[in-house]
A protein has these predicted regions:
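Glycine-rich phosphate/cofactor-binding loops in nucleotide/flavin-utilizing enzymes
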Residues: 1-10, 106-163
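Glycine-rich beta->alpha junctions and the first turn(s) of the following alpha-helix
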Residues: 1-55, 142, 158
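Short beta-alpha connecting loops at secondary-structure transitions
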Residues: 1-6, 41, 69-84, 137-143
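Glycine-rich, flexible loop segments associated with nucleotide phosphate handling
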Residues: 18, 34-43, 74-81, 121-133
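Generic, well-ordered alpha-helical scaffold segments in large soluble proteins
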Residues: 19-27, 48, 58-61, 65, ...
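C-terminal helix-coil-helix/basic helical segment that borders enzyme active sites and/or dimer interfaces
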Residues: 32, 53-122
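A generic structural signal for well-ordered alpha-helical surface patches
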Residues: 43, 79, 86, 93, ...
């Protein structure tokens, strides 16, 4: 249960959301306007932010339950850990997808030298674009480790529905 509750770092997801908002505010693909002025993209950012806040509240309730009734009280987290793992990995993946979409083709170049101290060449695209695609690809695996999301769904079904 512990690895599933920590598998999707809320702090990391909040950081990804801040980066996404910065990208959307600076990118001017929407008819010369920042991307966050595009109603469709702004709605998608708002949706993921609401999901992240809901997940944070869910996590706090689970931690509270565990701290009151946890292993010392003879109970462990039940489906909460599985649900948190599923939702947090889905949110992580959607955040990185939106980041790649926000910077468009600038997501592709990976300038490893630009990350080194002393780099003074112009970067391809915005500074925050560097490493965006590797991050996106890295977060494809989060739905697999700590038990794939499909396995987590099965565990929830067995535990909660008696299947």
């Amino acid at each position: 249960a512990h690895e599933r509750m920590s598998g999707g770092s809320l702090g990391q997801q909040k950081s990804l959301l801040r980066q996404l908002k910065q990208m959307a505010a600076e990118d001017e693909r929407c008819g010369g306007q920042p991307l966050d002025k595009d109603p469709t993209f702004a709605r998608r950012i708002a949706e993921i932010e609401m999901e992240l806040r809901t997940l944070e509240a869910f996590n706090m309730r689970a931690i509270d339950k565990f701290s009151r009734d946890g292993e010392l009280g003879g109970k462990a987290l039940g489906a909460e850990a599985n649900i948190f793992k599923i939702r947090s990995t889905e949110i992580q993946q959607r955040l990185t997808e939106l980041k790649v979409e926000a910077i468009n083709y600038y997501a592709m170049p990976y300038q490893i030298a630009a990350l080194k101290h002393g780099w003074n060449e112009p970067a391809v695209g915005a500074e925050y674009a560097n490493g965006c695609m590797p991050s996106y690809l890295h977060f494809r695996k989060v739905s697999i480790y700590s038990g794939s999301n499909e396995i987590q769904h099965g565990i929830i079904a067995k535990a909660q529905l008696g299947m």
